[in-house]
Structures are given as C-alpha cells and as structure tokens.
Design a protein with these regions (language model features):
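Active-site core of glycosidic bond-cleaving carbohydrate-active enzymes
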Residues: 2-187
C-alpha cells in the first residue's frame, strides 16, 4: 500500500498521497516491527485497539524491503539476517535453534522472487546464481518447465516464472535487461 501510494503520487501528481504513504510507512515501522521482525498483519482486538498478530513469514520481511518501507540502513540486522540466514532451503525454520525465529518459508511467487530481486539489488551475483540453480534446476529436470510454487502442487508451467531469466543473465553477465542504461555491474 505504501509503495502504491508513492507510485500514484509520482505518476498522477495527486497532492497528499506522498504524505499519506509516509504515514503508512511510519505506522508500520512503529507497530508491525516486533521482536526484530515484521508481523504479517495487525488486527483489532475486542476493545478496538489495533494490535500485532503472531504471524511471521519470510515473505512479509521481503515485502518490507522490496517495497522500500524498510531498508538495509533502517533495519540492518534484519536485512542481513534475511539475506544470509533465511531463505536457504529449510533454513526459514528455526532448526531447533531457540534463538532463531521461526518464519513460515516463502513460496516461489512472490516471496522467492522478491528475495532474488533483493540479492540482485545488492549485487550478490554468485549467491543469486547459486539460488537460481537451487530453486529452479530440479523443476527443469522433472518437467522441463518452471513452476508457480516450490513444489509441483499447482501450475508446473507458469509463464511468470520465466522472469528468472533476468536474474540468471544478471548473475552471469552483470547486466540487467530491464534497466540497460545502468550498464554492467561492477562486481
């Protein structure tokens, strides 16, 4: 919602939308950030107060960074944690580690794609390529296609999944096909 308001303010020049977006962002940062992670949703209790739930997902964390509501400067510890500790096979689970928060793992669309986008933004080309292989290689071996989910439980020939080609081209050549004006990555 925050990013939508910002985009509408930019595209249509509607006064007040940018300010409304900033209020939404401030509210989320103040009320949805609990114990070092963002909760997925806030609800009204019986008194009418808005309170956080106990729903924590890997995807919610990626949404906050992908849409720039939070960033690697405002939430450095969480940002580093999400790129380096979570999102790797079953590592979203606590693995018996009582210090590590249990997050519901991301599915392919949208969570995994946002994760890959964040790796690309950070110019982590080697890790990006490794994760593309880890996420997509088995799919291509089993069906010759890319899937909607992490498993073959739904569409096993999802057109949107071809978006992974952008990540692979970037990982191999340092070139972003969507933004060629940026030139080649430095690393």
């Amino acid at each position: 919602y925050y990013a939508s308001l910002l985009a509408a303010a930019k595209v249509y020049g509607i006064k007040g939308l940018k300010e409304k977006a900033e209020k939404v962002k401030d509210y989320l940062l103040k009320n949805a950030y609990v114990d070092g992670f963002f909760v997925d949703n806030l609800i009204r209790n019986e008194k009418g107060d808005i309170i956080p739930t106990e729903n924590y997902t890997e995807t919610c964390q990626y949404y906050m960074f992908f849409f720039k509501c939070a960033d690697k400067h405002t939430h450095k510890e969480l940002f580093d944690k999400m790129l380096n500790e979570y999102g790797k096979s079953d590592s979203s689970a606590s693995g018996g580690n009582p210090v590590k928060k249990q997050l519901t793992p991301s599915n392919m669309i949208y969570g995994v794609y946002m994760r890959l986008e964040l790796l690309m933004r950070e110019q982590k080309r080697v890790e990006l390529l490794n994760e593309c292989v880890r996420y997509f290689y088995d799919m291509t071996q089993k069906t010759g296609t890319l899937w909607e989910n992490n498993t073959a439980s739904a569409s096993c020939d999802h057109g949107f999944a071809s978006y992974v080609s952008r990540f692979i081209i970037y990982a191999l050549f340092g070139f972003d096909v969507l933004y060629p004006e940026k030139g080649k990555a430095k690393n």
